[in-house]
């Protein structure tokens, strides 16, 4: 009863997952892409097929049967997502925030930066009050030609990696369903606890990882 094309994409995804999580994400995206286009084509109320709406339809379908059907299947994969994946998301969120803070045109930022912040508001709070603010202290992004130079000097490159890794570690815990404590960068060193809802966990994976990875693979090293 399962569409042949979707199954082949998923089998390909499982096969390459241990060695090439980037390709696994791409094959997984193709399965999702195929499923939501079939769904949109069968809905007469939808006049034009678009990726964002399609992914939202997939997310809504998963959430509708999350506890009864899908959680037991998908939860193990959420718990085993590799750290490299979270470094990828943390990196484009921090770079996007630095560019936005510096007034760099939106076209230079990854589109997933804006969409993920919009779908998971706590990420904006964490960036503004903690990781993004700290990252801005070492970054001075400027447009050079048709690219953005983040302006991080050699003395601060290790600090940049440390900030990205720490942020990625927090993101991984949030996706696992844990509550995390974030220390703000204010003088009082305010601490606040955050957690993701089930909808935010799925939004992070579908939009922040799979869709963002798809854009990166198709468009290369450009804002997409």
Question: Which residue ranges define each predicted feature?
Answer:
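Short amphipathic alpha-helical segments and their helix-coil junctions
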Residues: 2-18, 145-146, 151, 186-193
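Charged alpha-helical initiation segments
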Residues: 1-30, 35, 41-45
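Phosphate-binding glycine-rich loops and adjacent basic patches that engage nucleotide phosphates
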Residues: 18, 171-177, 199-207
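Helix-loop junctions and short alpha-helical segments
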Residues: 28, 35-182
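Accessory, usually C-terminal, subdomains that scaffold auxiliary metal cofactors
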Residues: 186-224
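Residue-level detector of well-ordered alpha-helical segments, enriched
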Residues: 23-28, 73, 206, 213
């Amino acid at each position: 009863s399962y569409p042949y094309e979707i199954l082949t994409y998923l089998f390909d995804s499982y096969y390459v997952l241990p060695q090439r999580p980037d390709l696994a994400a791409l094959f997984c995206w193709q399965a999702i892409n195929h499923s939501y286009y079939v769904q949109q084509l069968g809905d007469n109320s939808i006049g034009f097929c678009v990726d964002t709406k399609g992914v939202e339809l997939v997310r809504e379908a998963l959430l509708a049967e999350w506890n009864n059907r899908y959680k037991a299947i998908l939860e193990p994969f959420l718990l085993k997502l590799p750290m490299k994946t979270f470094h990828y998301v943390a990196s484009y969120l921090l770079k996007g925030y630095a560019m936005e803070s510096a007034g760099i045109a939106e076209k230079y930022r990854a589109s997933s930066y804006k969409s993920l912040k919009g779908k998971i508001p706590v990420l904006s709070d964490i960036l503004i009050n903690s990781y993004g603010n700290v990252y801005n202290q070492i970054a001075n992004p400027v447009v050079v030609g048709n690219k953005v130079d983040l302006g991080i000097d050699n003395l601060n490159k290790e600090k940049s990696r440390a900030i990205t890794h720490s942020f990625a570690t927090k993101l991984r815990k949030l996706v696992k369903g844990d509550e995390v404590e974030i220390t703000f960068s204010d003088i009082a060193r305010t601490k606040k606890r955050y957690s993701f809802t089930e909808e935010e966990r799925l939004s992070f994976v579908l939009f922040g990882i799979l869709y963002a990875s798809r854009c990166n693979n198709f468009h290369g090293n450009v804002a997409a």
